[in-house]
């Protein structure tokens, strides 16, 4: 979708002209403000007044445009999204050097308007400074206490697998969309850690909460919201912004009901989940008279939202990619099931089995690599002026560590655009780790739920492949399963249906 089409679709002529005049003033002010002390800037395409390089971008898949631009401008280049300068980092070595070796300088989070309306710089994912440090530290500590990535989580996942199988069985081997049952199952894992209990898949409070969160993730990455992030004064006339705001209002109301229910039965000697721990800390700070505490209602609401969304959408999306890829490539599914049958037999898979299932583990990793569900990462921001690989990048500059360029770096992967599990196998068929495998990002902003996500993917995937043969519907060939995906904040599989055929 072109920029002009996006603007005309959502704005009146008067509003558009007013916005353009405001942009012109900003552009003229900013164009003359560059300090002579600044060093060489990264190269990039010449921007147009007001629009910057927007006419160059495919707004539905901007990461593809960035990847193409790197062929002309190198692994570090800049583009202007309207008046906003954005530095793009491309390739494994460049991204790793920035996020790991220069973690402090590239460690802040850019909070775009579409995310600011959700959190106002509270919570874990979209906050900075001491608030971010305190919330992340508290979340990591308490999630570990409640078994995230450990034995406690394993038991919760194995229990949830049985509920998910029950849902699959209801379709009686007929074609169905895996989206909702998979998302509900994965959401229940984080719900049990955050709230201390799971929900029934028929509970409207739960299903509406999950569906709204998934819709916000999808809509937030739309072309119109990208335009909103650049020209936020267009917000009042954007349909997708209204959808996001409405979902936020309803989700907050439901969340407060759940939190208040936990508050009424709160027992400091018996913490049920993350919310209990936060409420206890909040009460302790209030009783001690601590001023400027970070443990307040807004941080609680947004931390729960962050954990819920991050713990649901990415894992659920990756698992659905994995099932679709098995239907598309039945010969790979054959090898996975042969290995599971030979090593596991009919018993329940456990995390310790991972090292005994090298091919299956390779398939899961290759699914994460090829699915590439967060291709642009979440945007970073420089915390200070920095000279990086000879280029000067000013404090407060938006930085995009292009994860798609890491996971598909041709210098790191033999077949970057193909589904090739051998990327993770040595010549003897044993699993090997790859440094360029970076689906959870890296550095200070690395996904704090990586351990839980890895456990969920392994247990859900192996258990489902142990129980079912996944096929395309009758009359549909594997070639018709599109690998391009649907782009939001994450990249979901294109709409499709699968048949879950029970294995004897």
Predicted regions and their residues:
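C-terminal helix/juxtamembrane-tail motif
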Residues: 1-11, 20-24, 277-280, 398, ...
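Terminal signal-anchor or tail-anchor transmembrane helices
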Residues: 2-36, 188, 455
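Cytochrome P450 heme-thiolate "Cys pocket" and heme-binding signature region
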Residues: 305, 427-457, 482-486
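Cytochrome P450 heme-binding "Cys pocket" and the immediately downstream C-terminal segment
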Residues: 330-332, 450-489
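Conserved cytochrome P450 K-helix/beta-meander segment immediately N-terminal to the heme-binding cysteine loop
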Residues: 401-429
């Amino acid at each position: 979708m072109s920029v002009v089409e996006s603007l005309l679709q959502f704005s009146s002529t008067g509003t558009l002209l007013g916005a353009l005049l405001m942009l012109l003033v900003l552009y003229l002010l900013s164009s003359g403000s560059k300090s002579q002390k600044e060093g060489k800037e990264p190269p990039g395409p010449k921007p147009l007044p007001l629009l910057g390089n927007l006419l160059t971008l495919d707004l539905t898949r901007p990461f593809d445009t960035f990847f193409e631009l790197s062929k002309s401008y190198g692994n570090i280049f800049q583009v202007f999204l309207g008046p906003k300068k954005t530095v793009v980092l491309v390739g494994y070595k460049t991204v790793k050097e920035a996020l790991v070796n220069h973690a402090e300088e590239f460690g802040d989070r850019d909070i775009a308007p579409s995310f600011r309306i959700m959190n106002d710089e509270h919570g874990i994912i979209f906050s900075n400074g001491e608030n971010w440090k305190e919330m992340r530290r508290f979340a990591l500590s308490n999630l570990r206490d409640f078994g995230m990535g450990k034995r406690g989580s394993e038991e919760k996942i194995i229990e949830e697998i049985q509920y998910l199988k029950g849902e699959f069985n209801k379709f009686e081997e007929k074609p169905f969309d895996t989206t909702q049952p998979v998302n509900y199952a994965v959401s229940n894992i984080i719900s049990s850690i955050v709230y201390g209990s799971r929900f029934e898949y028929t509970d409207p409070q739960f299903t509406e909460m999950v569906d709204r969160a998934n819709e916000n993730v999808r809509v937030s990455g739309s072309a119109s919201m990208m335009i909103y992030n650049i020209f936020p004064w267009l917000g009042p006339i954007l349909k997708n912004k209204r959808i996001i705001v409405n979902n936020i209002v309803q989700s907050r109301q439901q969340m407060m009901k759940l939190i208040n229910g936990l508050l009424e039965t709160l027992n400091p000697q018996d913490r049920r989940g993350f919310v209990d721990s936060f409420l206890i800390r909040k009460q302790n700070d209030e009783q001690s008279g601590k001023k400027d505490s970070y443990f307040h209602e807004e941080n609680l609401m947004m931390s729960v939202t962050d954990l819920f969304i991050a713990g649901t959408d990415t894992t659920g999306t990756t698992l659905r990619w994995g099932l679709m890829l098995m239907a598309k490539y039945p010969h790979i599914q054959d090898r996975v099931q042969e290995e599971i049958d030979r090593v596991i037999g009919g018993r329940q898979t456990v995390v310790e089995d991972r090292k005994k299932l090298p091919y299956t583990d390779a398939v899961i990793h290759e699914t994460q690599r090829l699915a590439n569900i967060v291709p642009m990462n979440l945007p970073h921001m420089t915390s200070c002026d920095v000279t990086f690989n000879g280029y000067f990048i000013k404090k407060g500059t938006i930085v995009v560590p292009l994860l798609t360029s890491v996971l598909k770096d041709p210098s790191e992967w033999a077949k970057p655009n193909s589904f090739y599990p051998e990327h993770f196998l040595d010549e003897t068929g044993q699993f090997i780790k790859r440094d360029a495998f970076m689906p959870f990002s890296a550095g200070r902003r690395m996904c704090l739920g990586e351990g839980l996500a890895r456990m969920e993917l392994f247990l859900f995937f192996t258990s489902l492949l142990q129980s079912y043969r996944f096929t395309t519907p009758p009359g549909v060939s594997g070639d018709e399963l599109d690998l391009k995906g649907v782009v939001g904040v994450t990249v979901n599989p294109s709409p499709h249906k699968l048949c879950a055929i029970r294995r004897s």
